[in-house]
């Protein structure tokens, strides 16, 4: 990263070092399930009021896979609404409270009472059109990016040009470096406060330069440039590349994207909830 990019962020981070970070992330752990003995991927049918959607669950995300299978077998998803629908972005469901929700009820907080550890298999699995991913709370209250125990979304997204993807990759790199630097500042909080108390400007400058160098080196280990597969998908079928590496992608739609499109094109009202309820009538394991 060029030094001038970080300067304003660096000075702000040092100036507000005395402010406490909010790290009250979601607690709880997911239920333990048996792992599949073979490499065959589980398929799940979602019978909705607008048609059937069939998804396939990735074996490389075993906690999410096993939890999804568990909830399907328990009937947790039977009757839940697609409570958040944004055209050219995604359709979201899995809020257990939505089964009996009235038309004015605000939804999005319902879950089984636990979260799931993030399972990022990136860049192999990314937010292409049709991707199945776990919803979660934001980074400020969930720095570990743990997934909701039940809520998930299916990506619809949009098609991007190569130029747009290049610009997005640069922004993602900048955000990553800011996150790294913020963590380093927190880790060096005591040292920074001591330098500030002693009014050691030279020491502060030296530490700032050191943290910038560490940030550069750490960010370089995981470049934000997209793979050929990502570029091909995002420039042909589309998706939501800005979510990559931030939310767990644990499966994909293998049949029924026409139904997904029907859902994403429905009229919505407050909080992006469809004005006419669209629900999962029944979820079932196919194999």
Give, region by region, the residue ranges found by the protein language model:
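Sec-dependent N-terminal signal peptides
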Residues: 6-12
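Positively charged n-region of N-terminal signal peptides that target proteins for export
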Residues: 1-4
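Cyclophilin-like peptidyl-prolyl cis-trans isomerases
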Residues: 7, 19-287
């Amino acid at each position: 990263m060029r030094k001038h990019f970080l300067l304003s962020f660096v000075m702000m981070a040092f100036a507000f070092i005395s402010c406490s970070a909010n790290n009250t992330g979601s607690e709880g752990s997911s239920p333990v399930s048996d792992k599949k003995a073979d490499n065959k991927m589980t398929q799940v049918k979602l019978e909705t009021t607008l048609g059937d959607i069939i998804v396939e669950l990735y074996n490389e995300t075993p906690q999410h896979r096993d939890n999804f299978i568990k909830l399907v077998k328990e009937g947790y998803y039977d009757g839940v609404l697609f409570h958040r629908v944004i055209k050219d972005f995604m359709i979201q469901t899995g809020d257990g409270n939505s089964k009996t929700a009235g038309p004015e009820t605000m939804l999005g907080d319902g879950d089984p009472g636990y979260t799931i550890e993030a399972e990022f298999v990136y860049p192999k699995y990314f937010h292409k059109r049709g991707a199945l991913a776990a919803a979660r709370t934001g980074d400020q209250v969930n720095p570990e990016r743990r997934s909701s125990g039940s809520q998930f979304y299916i990506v619809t997204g949009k098609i991007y040009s190569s130029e747009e993807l290049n610009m997005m990759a640069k922004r993602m790199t900048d955000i990553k470096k800011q996150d790294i630097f913020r963590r380093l500042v927190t880790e060096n909080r005591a040292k920074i406060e001591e330098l500030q108390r002693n009014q050691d400007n030279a020491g502060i400058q030296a530490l700032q330069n050191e943290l910038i160098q560490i940030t550069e080196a750490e960010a370089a280990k995981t470049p934000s440039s997209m793979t050929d597969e990502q570029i091909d998908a995002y420039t042909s079928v589309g998706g939501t590349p800005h979510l990559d590496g931030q939310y767990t992608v644990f499966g994909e739609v293998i049949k029924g994207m026409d139904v997904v499109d029907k859902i994403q094109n429905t009229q919505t009202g407050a909080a992006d909830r469809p004005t006419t309820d669209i629900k999962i009538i029944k979820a079932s394991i196919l194999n």
